[in-house]
C-alpha cells in the first residue's frame, strides 16, 4: 500500500486514477509486486489506508524509514545543510464574516453539519510573498548539500514565519555542522546560540532600512548563495511532481500530499 502512495505522489494522481493505473499498467504492477491475476486495492480501500496513516500520524515514521534506507545505500547527509521554505497553495475558502472572526481567534466554527465542515479547510491561512497573496500551507525543509536530499521537514499553515522552525530542522546526522539559509532567517541571538553549540551558521545578511550592504557583506552573500541555491533544485523537483498545490482539506492530510513528508521521502528516492 505504501508503494501506491509512491505512485500517487510521483505522478500526482487521484485515488481513482491510482486504482485505474495500477490495473492498466504492467510497469506499475511490477513495481507493486503484483501479477495480472492479483487483487488490487480499490480507490476506497486506498483512501481508508491514507486515512489510517493520517490518524496514526505515521507520515514521519515513513519518512524516517526512507532516511534509513538512504543511509544503508550510502546516501549519508554530508557537507552541511540548506534550510528554506516554500508555499503550498490550497483552494481558496469562502467564509462568512462571523466564521472569519472565529477562525482568527484560533477556534473552529460550530455551526453547520459535520459534512459541511468537512468541506471547509480550517487550517490553511493567507500570507504575502513579494507583494502577492497566497492561501494554503508552508513546507519548511532541510536538505543536505552533497546529495540535495530532504532530511527534515515541517509543514505549517502559510502564515507561519519561515524562521519559526529553523532549529527544528537542524539535522544532527549531517557530517558537517555548517548550515546555510537566505536573509529571511536573520536572527542574531539565535546565530550566537547555535554558534556556541558548535554550529557554523551562514545566513545571508539583509540591509537595514536606509542603508546598503558593505562590499564585504555583499561578497559574503554571494558565496552563501552559490551553496544555498542547491536547495532550490529540491523545490523545483517537487514542483514538477505537483508538490506546490494540494487538493485535500486540512493540515493533517497535507502531510500525505505534495511536499509533505511522504512526497519528500519519495522525491529523495527518485
Model-predicted regions and their roles:
Residues 254-270:
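Charge-patterned, long linear interaction tracts outside catalytic cores
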Residues 10, 24, 28, 55, ...:
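Short, well-ordered loop/turn and helix-capping segments at boundaries between secondary-structure elements
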Residues 1-12:
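Alpha-helical support elements that line or immediately flank enzyme active sites
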Residues 20-23, 33, 37, 41-196, ...:
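Polybasic low-complexity intrinsically disordered regions
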Residues 178, 183-256:
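Helix-centered, glycine/charged polyanion-binding patches within enzymatic domains
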Amino acid at each position: 500500500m505504501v508503494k501506491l502512495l509512491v505512485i500517487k505522489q510521483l505522478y500526482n494522481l487521484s485515488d481513482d486514477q491510482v486504482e485505474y493505473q495500477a490495473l492498466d499498467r504492467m510497469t506499475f504492477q511490477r513495481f507493486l509486486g503484483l501479477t495480472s491475476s492479483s487483487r488490487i486495492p480499490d480507490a476506497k480501500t486506498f483512501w481508508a489506508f491514507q486515512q489510517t496513516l493520517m490518524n496514526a500520524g505515521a507520515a514521519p515514521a515513513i519518512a524516517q524509514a526512507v532516511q534509513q534506507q538512504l543511509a544503508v545505500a550510502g546516501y549519508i547527509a554530508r557537507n552541511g545543510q540548506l534550510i528554506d521554505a516554500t508555499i503550498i497553495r490550497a483552494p481558496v475558502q469562502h467564509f462568512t464574516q462571523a466564521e472569519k472572526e472565529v477562525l482568527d481567534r484560533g477556534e473552529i466554527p460550530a455551526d453547520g453539519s459535520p459534512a459541511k465542515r468537512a468541506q471547509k479547510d480550517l487550517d490553511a491561512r493567507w500570507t504575502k510573498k513579494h507583494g502577492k497573496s497566497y492561501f494554503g500551507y508552508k513546507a519548511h525543509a532541510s536538505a543536505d548539500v552533497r546529495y540535495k536530499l530532504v532530511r527534515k521537514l515541517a509543514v505549517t499553515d502559510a502564515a507561519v514565519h519561515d524562521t519559526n522552525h529553523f532549529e527544528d530542522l537542524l539535522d544532527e546526522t549531517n557530517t558537517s555542522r555548517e548550515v546555510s539559509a537566505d536573509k529571511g532567517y536573520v536572527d542574531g541571538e539565535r546565530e550566537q546560540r547555535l554558534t556556541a553549540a558548535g554550529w557554523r551558521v551562514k545566513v545571508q545578511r539583509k540591509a537595514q532600512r536606509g542603508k546598503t550592504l558593505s562590499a564585504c557583506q555583499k561578497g559574503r552573500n554571494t558565496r552563501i548563495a552559490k551553496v544555498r541555491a542547491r536547495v532550490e533544485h529540491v523545490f523545483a523537483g517537487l514542483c514538477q511532481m505537483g508538490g506546490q498545490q494540494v487538493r485535500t482539506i486540512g493540515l493533517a492530510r497535507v502531510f500525505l500530499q505534495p511536499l509533505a513528508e511522504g512526497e519528500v521521502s519519495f522525491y529523495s528516492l527518485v
